[in-house]
Design a protein with these regions (language model features):
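Flexible internal linker/loop segments at domain or repeat junctions
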Residues: 16-42
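Non-catalytic alpha-helical scaffold/packing segments enriched in small hydrophobic residues
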Residues: 14-21, 53-57
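CBM-like carbohydrate-recognition segments
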Residues: 43-56, 61-62, 67-138
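Single conserved hydrophobic/aromatic residue that forms the stacking wall/gate
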Residues: 1-12
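Flexible, active-site-adjacent loop/turn segments at secondary-structure boundaries
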Residues: 12, 30-34, 99-100, 117-119
Length: 138
């Protein structure tokens, strides 16, 4: 068996615990606030880059984690995150947003760096998540 999960049961189990914690702490639309421990106010920034990374990870983890219920919940959140990221709120119009795909990412708010901006890695993980999702449908 050359499966990536061979001998990694404990690793995937721990990753499942982390994923479950994230599911409990995400807002209804799946786009996290810039910090899970930040006070939530109307002006609290959302982080599209974190959502894109999570969506990609939820899809990948769903391929290896045992249990149908966990797989379904990870995929459901990934789908929700991808749909929200593809909405007008987060998806930039072509030729805008410095030609980046996603809007509203946060790099380092405490340093006042990369706040509510497009980020290269947000686009990368968004595209990776879309590709992983497409490949699941095959």
């Amino acid at each position: 068996d050359r499966s990536p999960s061979r001998g990694l049961g404990d690793v995937y189990k721990r990753q499942g615990h982390i994923a479950d914690m994230l599911l409990r702490r995400l807002p209804a639309d799946g786009i996290p606030y810039w910090d899970f421990d930040a006070p939530i106010e109307e002006q609290t920034y959302r982080d599209a880059s974190a959502a894109a990374i999570m969506a990609s990870a939820f899809i990948e983890l769903s391929r290896y984690i045992p249990g149908t219920e966990a797989k379904e919940s990870y995929l459901a959140m990934a789908e929700k995150q991808l749909r929200t990221l593809a909405s007008k709120e987060y998806l930039a119009e072509p030729g805008t947003n410095e030609c980046f795909i996603l809007k509203h990412s946060v790099g380092a708010l405490p340093d006042k760096s990369e706040v509510d901006v497009p980020l290269t890695y947000a686009d990368y993980y968004f595209l990776e998540a879309l590709l992983r999702y497409k490949n699941l449908q095959k």
